[in-house]
């Protein structure tokens, strides 16, 4: 028991089961009693009556289960949960249980036993040792479970309860407000650079400073207002015999000029009539209209009159 690190003043719950020897159980209890001293306490409990004993929660610093040599009990999930409940936060559980090397319905493997301890709310699950079962424990196990395999071994594991109650809650201080970022420190400016970009009013009257007069940059020709002819490109409407044609992206005004000329030609060549209704058809024509009998036509459309009506009868 020296490897358990049980200290004076600790409260220990010793869980035993059949077919443990009463003499061996008494010796183990007395050994633990000498370790905890008068300020501590050692309580004995049968595994089959653990759930009915109603121990107070978080009472024991240690729970030692099935550590007797002839013990061969299987810890159910309810039993492990009850052991975790009665342990103080930060307390430890040390147990021994027969395991198998292969998957079986009656017995667990060492890995599944570790998972069962973790599911009970315990942490820091560690396998301490593994060894064979005693003949008495093996016989009792085969009788209770019917297991006839040859891969049995006895494993000792330890686990700890977290430093808080399992299922306890605590309010978290969370801040969802927007945090104002701290202004970043601006890099220091080089004094020489800052001086180069600073213009003093006194520098304007310095004789060594040469200021350029903007009016001196323009000559007399630059101040003249250009006429429209000078703005045209040399090849714009080139040639006296060729028809004038504006450029694709004309910006000198030739395109607008040619458009106005074409509109004037169309206006002059459009035929005129006294009544202005000849093109609508016979219903709108005069009795002496030369277009009588002809179909309606569009305004300005060229119409050729037949010369049959001009011959003498």
Curated annotation (Swiss-Prot):
Keywords: 2Fe-2S, 4Fe-4S, Apoptosis, Cytoplasm, Iron, Iron-sulfur, Metal-binding, Mitochondrion, Nucleus. [2Fe-2S] cluster binds at residues 236, 247, 250, 252. The keyword NADP does not apply. Residues 6-170 are annotated as: N-terminal SAM-like domain. Component of the cytosolic iron-sulfur (Fe-S) protein assembly (CIA) machinery required for the maturation of extramitochondrial Fe-S proteins. Part of an electron transfer chain functioning in an early step of cytosolic Fe-S biogenesis, facilitating the de novo assembly of a [4Fe-4S] cluster on the scaffold complex NUBP1-NUBP2. Electrons are transferred to CIAPIN1 from NADPH via the FAD- and FMN-containing protein NDOR1. One of its GO terms (cellular component) is nucleus. A motif (Cx2C motif 1) lies at residues 275-278. This is Anamorsin-B. Belongs to the anamorsin family. A motif (Cx2C motif 2) lies at residues 286-289.
């Amino acid at each position: 028991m020296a490897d358990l690190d049980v200290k004076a003043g600790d409260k220990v719950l010793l869980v035993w089961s059949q077919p443990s020897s009463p003499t061996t159980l008494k010796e183990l209890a007395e050994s633990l009693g000498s370790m905890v001293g008068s300020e501590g306490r050692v309580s004995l409990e049968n595994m089959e009556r653990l759930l009915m004993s109603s121990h107070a929660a978080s009472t024991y610093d240690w729970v030692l289960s099935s550590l007797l040599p002839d013990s061969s009990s299987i810890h159910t999930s309810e039993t492990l949960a009850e052991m975790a409940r009665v342990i103080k936060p930060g307390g430890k559980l040390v147990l021994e249980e027969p395991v198998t090397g292969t998957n079986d319905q009656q017995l667990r493997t060492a890995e599944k036993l570790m998972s069962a301890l973790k599911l009970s709310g315990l942490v820091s699950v560690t396998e301490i040792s593994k060894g064979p079962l005693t003949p008495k424990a093996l016989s009792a196990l085969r009788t209770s479970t019917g297991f006839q395999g040859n891969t049995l071994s006895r494993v000792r594991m330890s686990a700890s309860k977290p430093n808080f109650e399992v299922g306890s809650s605590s309010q978290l201080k969370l801040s969802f407000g927007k945090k104002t970022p701290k202004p970043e420190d601006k890099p220091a400016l080089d004094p020489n650079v800052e001086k180069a970009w600073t213009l003093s009013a006194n520098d304007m009257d310095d004789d060594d400073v040469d200021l350029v007069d903007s009016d001196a940059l323009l000559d007399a020709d630059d101040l003249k207002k250009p006429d429209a002819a000078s703005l045209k490109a040399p090849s714009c409407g080139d040639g006296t015999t060729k028809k004038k044609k504006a450029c694709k992206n004309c910006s000198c005004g030739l395109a607008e000029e040619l458009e106005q000329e074409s509109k004037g030609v169309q206006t002059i060549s459009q035929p005129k009539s006294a009544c202005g209704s000849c093109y609508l058809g016979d219903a709108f024509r005069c009795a002496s209209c030369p277009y009588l009998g002809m179909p309606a036509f569009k305004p300005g459309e060229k119409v050729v009159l037949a010369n049959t009506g001009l011959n003498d009868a």
